Amino acid sequence: MSVIAITVFIVTYALIASDRVNKTLAALTGAAIVVTLPIINSEDVFYSHETGIDWEVIFLLLSMMIIVSVLRQTGVFEYVAIWTAKRSHGSPLRILLLLVLVMALGSALLDNVTTVLLIAPVTLLVCERLTINAAPFLMAEVFASNIGGAATLVGDPPNIIIASRAGFSFNDFLIHLTPIVIIVTVVLSALLPRLFRGAFAVDPERVADIMSLNEREAIRDRWLLIKCGVVLLLVFVAFIAHPVLHTGPSLVGMLGAGILIVISKLERSDYLSSVKWETLLFFAGLFIMVGALVKTDVVNQLARATTTLTGGHELLTVVLTLGVSTLVSSIIDNIPYVATMTPIVSELVASMPDQSHTDILWWALALGADFGGNLTAVGASANVVMLEIAKSAGTPISFWEFTRKGIAVTVISIALAGIYLWLRYLVMS
């Protein structure tokens, strides 16, 4: 069964990468095959935490899509778009750098998918006003999102899994991972002009038009904006405090979305029209296929085969953990991969001869899984959401267009992460 699961996954992945077949149709077809055979049964699909659909991700996405739909009715995205363009004096590069920094910071404090859903509409409006291609902006922002999400415990779901297994606190992530995230973000910002060379030309007349606009006139419903602001603030506080509240982000998001639906008194079409149902179905199909790989022990065997190559050598173990985490997380969702790897890393930590700085293996796992999401268009949930937003806005980004840029960003990010881990934990310690 493992051979069939691998074959179905590879064929489906190839179809998605070809951009010739609708990726949602490909994912659902692959999912239907592994369920029909049956490699994985309906009980596993709908109820298993290890092999089933990650409902936490699905409902978090749905709730934030609804919140963004309600927020869009206020005109606040137009306001922020005009404000950003004016403060940057219409310079596309300055706008991009500002949005990248906001995205990285936001993804450290919130789930990176949430940050993407909030910032992407602003980006599209800015680019529309300046009549420039939004694709480089969207790609740069999602790169920053995946990098920034590694900085804190709440920034990316794999960090929560690692923290639970290793006993790390919120402050542990701040102390150990935030420094390298800052370094990589700065390097990414410096790399962007070269990575997207020629994407920052703008018509001076469009800049003059932007500078003449009054952003306050963009607000259409101030009272609804105040309501949305209060609800969003409460949602964000609950996101950050969820380790204390023991409440999942999806439940918090759904409560926030439900409250906004009630108090906004909008028509159903106003808040459901912007929900990316196709994206949600794509994730469901992807989770089912990855679940089949987990169920047939493919992911576990891959992880164990990698660890046997290290022979207990500390530096080699770190390099392999970082490298394999990067590669595997670029192909399958990093959540099931990290969930599979944590018990193996725990065994490795216990078997290491030198117990003085074994935490390095956990940080290698976290950085590889988080940074590896930038390698391909399906490497992270935020990537898929951003590509769907771009497609809906009439600025489609192909799988290979994203991946070509993602390879450069990931290679540099992982190289810096490897040097950081080596210097901080194996040399300076």
From Swiss-Prot:
Main location: membrane
Transmembrane portions of the chain: 26-46, 51-71, 99-119, 173-193, 224-244, 279-299, 315-335, 360-380, 407-427
Gene Ontology CC entries for this record: plasma membrane
Keyword Cell division in annotation: no
UniProt keywords, alphabetically: Cell membrane, Membrane, Transmembrane, Transmembrane helix, Transport
Family: Belongs to the CitM (TC 2.A.11) transporter family.
Protein name: 46 kDa membrane protein
